[in-house]
From Swiss-Prot:
Region entry Disordered, spans: 1127-1163
Gene: rrp12
Biased composition (Basic and acidic residues): 1143-1157
Location of this chain's protein in the cell: Nucleus; Cytoplasm, Cytoskeleton, Microtubule organizing center, Spindle pole body
Keywords: Cytoplasm, Cytoskeleton, Nucleus, Ribosome biogenesis
Function in brief: Required for nuclear export of the ribosomal subunits. Required for maturation of the RNA components of pre-ribosomes.
Species: Schizosaccharomyces pombe (strain 972 / ATCC 24843)
Secretion signal span: none
Family: Belongs to the RRP12 family.
Keyword Nucleus recorded: yes
Full protein name: Putative ribosomal RNA-processing protein 12
One GO biological process term: maturation of SSU-rRNA
Gene Ontology molecular functions: RNA binding
InterPro entries: ARM-like (IPR011989), ARM-type_fold (IPR016024), RRP12 (IPR052087), RRP12-like_dom (IPR012978)
A Pfam family that the UniProt record links to this protein: RRP12_HEAT
Length: 1163
């Protein structure tokens, strides 16, 4: 008899091996009965056969025991996922004939209904268009879902709504885009709504609940698909009647329904329905004194206006803009929610504007409203919203904001200059919108800076410079050259004329000069007049600034970089950052690049000189600028730069020979360092004619005595191996390159390790067959590098190991088939297990784990069993580093490989693992416990418990009870009616790290469930209450008279957390920062006493330090209090730590205080 398919087999095994009492037995009984029936009938155990057998059980639903009913449908939900779609589609009427009668059974509860509804969803999603339009099966199923969607049972009601929404959002392929079921799906709820809306007598609570349920159902339908046009008028009429009944919840649901109608009208271009919706909304405007209803109405109006602007722009402009005044008066409200939503709605109204004269008349009226509001005390609270509206107007009108919005700009400037005005940040954002819209030149005509100080009565606006800096783009570069360059010169001249350069006026003027030049990157962001404004005169000014003002070099270089990058992106038709449209065409940008190319030679010469004279910590902007300009330079220019660098390089290397001096901060590094950095930047833009020379330089650099030169040599090699001509040369000379790298292996130091690994990785990415024979020679270095402290070096080592494995797996040198090659490669790695050092052995185990995870589908079961048995021996190692790596490998094996591979080895694995469960240091003890928990979930507690000796039975008993308790908690917390909000899983650098360091499945599931439940808020108007329970296992008895004392309006968990933090200070901690808690009550009392004593001692020490310590006060003449201003060196010394720096020409930097490292030592 054929077996069921593997995924279904795994799922069935999981539920049958579940360790929870009650659940496991019933699932096992049902599955065993089904399989026994299939064997008796000599039927193949396919998913379809399971489905038929389970449907037979469903026919006998009334005869089943209560617990078996829910489990039968859960199994049915599981099995139906693996049944072929064509079978479910063809046999849907027969399946439904079995499922439909279950609805009428009085004993049906949520344990049955939830999987029942899931089965129904699966069946309906598979039906084609003809099934929906012909026959009654689909219609019957929809009526079943509508029945539960209107029920009072929350979980089944919400799940039914989710299923209906999912079905309507996924219509079958057919002649129309909307779902064919929407007609009868919408008709029944609407008919019920009309009957409830027209009822004149007061409604009972049950009728109110039914009304709200029907409104929620219609809201789901409207937001999922297009409401039938023939029913829109009837729905709007019912909405008007319901709003007249003045039920807050019902009115909010009405607004949400109309909001959904507006959204879907856009998707289906139904302007008629949208017009009826907007008319209905205008009739249903609530009182401005009701914030809840007003916010809901404004949201619906906002959606309707935006939809109208998409479908019918002309009508929207005239029908929506006349409501601006009515909307604007709502900004007087004291409710912040109303003001915020009003501003959003007004911005949508502004979106209906265009650049025609009629719109400009409306803009002038809107601007007048805003100016009057900013002067009116009634709108004092609405200033932020007014600024938001002004910004929206500027973004919509663009350059046309001048002159129509200039009055608003003047009012804003007046407000910012007022004393006591506290909204300057918001004003700056609004003014920034004006800068982006009309440009800096027009802005400064309205609001001049007045920095010349020619007119004593003029108001200075130095605060405007940072606003300009952050918002200038697509401007005229001529404005900077004609206005700001002379202004900067005047201010700088005043600085020079001052005698004291350290005086406050001098520093203020220098700050203004720096702020003026900080505007240049904005002016260089795709300027409109580049070719006419970027003259030789302006270029000479930039060169002088680069040479003379060191503090402005980064600004100038960033400007030159932006000039090239923005034009390059536009020329290549790539989007600019956060910019939808640009005012420069691709052809104009290409012309600009050609213009800049003619100037690149001169600029590169200057930049090379400046680069060599700049301290290393300030070089990055210059180096990036050089790289950017080389990109657009001609081949002759690139060759000229290359020749300059290489001509100076030999002498500079000779000057550096035998020198290990490290340049201090603020001092330029040796010339050789600068030249090699430039060579690395230039090399990607050269061609194959330079390949031989460049690789000769690599040879020379790698053999240099200076480690910094070696590091740069590896960087140059890595760069060459990633460009086309370098790859071509390396492919032909791969053997020589590898021999060169092998010959300098003994010269490698920690600072060059990462770059060497990157070069080797780039070499193996070529996948040359000549490198296969070198694998045994390179593997030890790659393996030991897996234990590098530097994270980037460690990740590069993993990449190198995988590339080596890829070469081996693709080579016939390791076997004839892929499984054989993988196993042989793992065997080659296993040679490292015989290493003499702890590091090498643990690194080898990590390497084996990584390769096994990467190629697990090719590894045979016998080889895997042998591998696990071998590494099992290392679990008992006395070296924690080795044991940890071996335990991680076992964890990977348990997680990734079939049960049959691991189960036979449990008698050997578990005793060895238990040896570490008694470890005093908690790291391995917790790791082993988590591994046992994972085994218990996968194999079942009953399978692993026999291998626990008597003295360790307590551990497995605790694990079993913990799992059962977690299952009960999740069962109580799980709410299928609420949508899942699972957190995104953390990503890792490799499959090995994902398997070893990822969160435990069960713990993650608990976390996600807790997050889901904690995130679901109740009624926003209801005060929050907290219940404090003494025992987690026994829920609070609310009928008890003492229950009142357990309910609080404040969260008791905060006090409990503070109390725990206080108690935790009494416990000892191990080297990993974990608390060590003794089981003895006496020890706890001793620890508490010690904690109290330490607390009192700390108070006393602090007091004595305050009155008699180094920083205490003294009394001087006339009994005045004096404090010492001397800095005590001992108080400020920080621990030095080695850090990897890009270049050894810098001093080792002082490391900042590292709390994570030093926190383990009691700091």
């Amino acid at each position: 008899m054929a077996e069921v398919n593997e995924p279904l087999q795994i799922e069935l095994r999981k539920i049958r091996n579940s360790s929870t009492a009650g659940v496991i037995n019933e699932f096992d009984v049902i599955v065993s009965a089904v399989e026994g029936t299939l064997k008796e009938q000599k039927t193949e155990a396919t998913p379809t056969a399971y489905l038929v057998a389970l449907l037979t059980l469903v026919k006998e639903f009334t005869d089943l025991k209560k617990n078996f009913k829910g489990h039968t449908f859960q199994l049915l939900e599981l099995v139906i996922k693996y049944v072929p779609s064509n079978v479910l589609q063809a046999k849907f009427p027969q399946i439904l004939s079995v499922l439909a009668p279950v609805v009428n059974n009085a004993e049906t509860n949520k344990t049955v209904l939830l999987p029942y509804l899931n089965v129904l969803e699966k069946l309906l999603l598979l039906q084609d268009y003809s099934s929906w339009t012909h026959g009654n099966s689909c219609k019957t199923s929809i009526y079943i879902l509508l029945f539960f969607a209107l029920s009072n049972t929350e979980k089944t009601r919400v799940r039914s709504l989710q299923i209906l929404a999912n079905i309507l959002k996924n219509p079958p392929a057919g002649p129309v885009t909307e779902h064919p079921a929407i007609k009868y799906t919408a008709f029944e709820p609407l008919r019920l709504l009309e009957s409830l809306a027209t009822a004149k007598k007061p409604k009972t609570p049950a009728e109110v609940q039914k009304l709200n349920n029907s409104l929620v159902l219609i809201r789901v339908l409207c937001s999922s698909t297009h409401w039938p046009m023939t029913l829109v008028e009837r729905l709007c009429r019912s909405c008007v009647l319901i709003v007249g009944q003045r039920s807050t919840n019902s009115i909010l649901l009405v607004y949400q329904i109309l909001d959904g109608l507006s959204k879907k009208s856009v998707d289906y271009t139904d302007a008629v329905s949208l017009r009826m919706t907007l008319i209905c909304l205008q009739k249903l405007e609530p009182s401005e004194h009701d914030p809840i209803l007003m916010v809901g109405w404004l949201k619906a109006m906002n959606t309707a206006i935006r939809a109208f602007n998409i479908l019918d722009k002309e009508t929207a402009k005239y029908e929506c803009l006349h409501r601006f005044k009515a909307f604007f008066t709502l900004l007087e409200s004291e409710s912040m929610e109303i003001r915020l939503q009003t501003a959003t709605t007004i911005c949508s109204v502004i979106g209906c504007l265009d650049t025609t004269p009629n719109s400009f008349a409306v803009v002038e009226e809107i601007c007048s409203f805003i100016c009057d509001a900013l002067r009116d005390i009634r709108f004092r609270l609405a200033y932020p919203e007014c600024f938001q509206i002004i910004s929206s107007l500027c973004d919509k009108l663009g350059p046309h904001s001048d002159p129509y919005l200039i009055p608003a700009l003047e009012v804003i400037d007046y407000l910012r200059g007022s004393e006591g005005f506290d909204g300057k940040a918001l004003v700056d954002e609004a003014i920034g919108s004006f800068v982006r819209a009309i440009g800096p030149e027009a802005m400064l005509r309205v609001l001049p800076l007045n920095l010349e100080l020619n007119d004593k009565d003029a108001v200075g606006r130095a605060w405007l410079l940072p606003v300009l800096r952050d918002n200038i783009r697509f401007a005229n570069l001529a404005h900077f050259t004609n206005y700001f360059v002379p202004l900067s010169g005047q201010l700088y001249q005043k600085v020079i004329e001052m005698n004291d350069l350290d005086s406050i006026p001098s520093k203020l003027l220098q700050t203004l000069v720096d702020q003026i030049w900080s505007l240049l990157p904005g002016y260089c962001y795709l300027p409109l007049d580049l070719q006419s404004s970027f003259t030789l005169e302006f270029a000479s000014i930039l060169v002088n600034v680069l040479y003379e003002q060191v503090s402005l070099r980064s600004v100038i270089c960033n400007s030159l970089t932006a000039l090239v990058e923005t034009n390059s992106k536009v020329a290549d038709k790539l989007p600019l950052d956060d910019v939808i449209s640009v005012p420069v065409s691709a052809s104009d940008a290409s012309s600009n690049l050609a213009f800049l190319t003619n100037m690149s030679s001169n600029f590169l010469s200057v930049l090379l000189n400046v680069f060599s004279s700049t301290p290393s910590q300030y070089r990055y902007p210059i180096l990036k600028c050089i790289q950017t300009w080389i990109f657009i330079s001609s081949n002759d220019t690139i060759h000229s730069v290359y020749k300059k660098v290489t001509d100076l390089l030999p002498d500079s290397l000779n000057d550096l020979a035998g020198s290990f001096n490290i340049a201090a901060d603020g001092i330029s590094s040796p010339m050789a360092y600068s030249l090699i950095d430039l060579l690395i930047v230039i090399s990607p833009y050269l061609n194959q004619d330079y390949a031989v020379t460049l690789f000769e330089y690599v040879h020379e650099f790698l053999r240099h005595v200076n480690p910094a030169i070696q590091k740069k040599g590896y960087k140059l090699l890595g760069t060459l191996l990633r460009v086309d001509y370098g790859k071509a040369y390396a492919t032909q000379h791969v053997k020589e390159i590898f021999e060169e790298l092998s010959s300098v292996a003994d010269r490698v130091v920690s600072s060059t390790r990462k770059d060497r690994l990157a070069s080797l990785n780039a070499l193996y990415e070529l996948q040359s067959s000549e490198l296969v024979i070198a694998i045994p020679q390179l593997l030890p270095e790659a393996i030991i590098s897996l234990k590098e402290v530097n994270e980037k070096a460690r990740h590069t080592a993993f990449q190198l190991l995988f590339n080596i494995a890829k070469s081996a797996v693709n080579s016939v040198e390791f076997g004839n088939s892929k499984p054989e090659r993988v196993e042989k490669f793992v065997s080659v790695i296993s040679a490292g297990l015989a290493g003499s050092s702890t590091h090498m052995i643990s690194a080898t185990i990590i390497a084996i784990s990584s390769i096994v995870m990467e190629y697990k589908v090719f590894i045979s079961e016998p080889f895997l069993v042998q591998l696990i048995s071998t590494l099992n021996l290392f679990i008992t190692s006395s070296k924690r580093e080795i044991a940890k790596a071996a335990i991680d490998f076992i964890k990977i094996s348990v997680s990734s490989f079939p049960v049959e591979c691991i189960k036979p080895l449990l008698p050997e694995l578990i005793p060895n693992l238990l040896a570490w469960s008694h470890e005093g240091k908690a790291n391995l003890r917790v790791k082993v416990r988590h591994l046992f928990e994972k085994m218990g979930r996968k194999y079942g507690i009953a399978e692993i418990e026999p291998f626990f000796p008597a003295e360790d039975k307590k551990l497995i008993t605790n694990i079993r009870k913990t799992q059962e308790r977690n299952i009960r908690k999740r069962a109580m917390k799980r709410d299928p009616a609420k949508p899942s909000s699972a957190q995104p899983r953390k990503t890792f650098a490799s499959a090995y790290e994902a398997a070893v360091y990822d969160t435990d499945d069960e713990a993650e599931e608990e976390f996600e469930n807790d997050e889901m439940n904690n995130g679901n808020g109740g009624d926003l108007r209801m005060d929050e209450a907290f219940v404090q329970e003494d025992n987690d296992e026994e829920p609070l008895d609310l009928l008890d008279i003492e229950a009142v004392s357990k309910i609080s309006s404040t969260d008791p968990r905060k006090k409990l957390a503070a109390r725990k933090q206080k108690l935790n200070s009494a416990f000892k901690s191990n080297e990993e920062g974990r608390l060590l808690i003794n089981d003895s009550d006496e020890d706890e009392l001793i620890e508490d006493s010690l904690a109290n004593a330490q607390q009192h001692a700390e108070v006393n020490r602090t007091y004595l330090e305050a009155v008699a310590g180094k920083e205490s006060f003294r009394r001087g003449l006339n009994n005045r209090v004096k404090f010492s201003n001397k800095r005590v060196r001992d108080d400020y010394d920080e621990e030095m730590e080695e850090v990897e720096v890009p270049e050894v020409t810098r001093k080792p930097a002082k490391q900042k205080f590292d709390r994570k490292q030093r926190g383990q030592k009691g700091y």
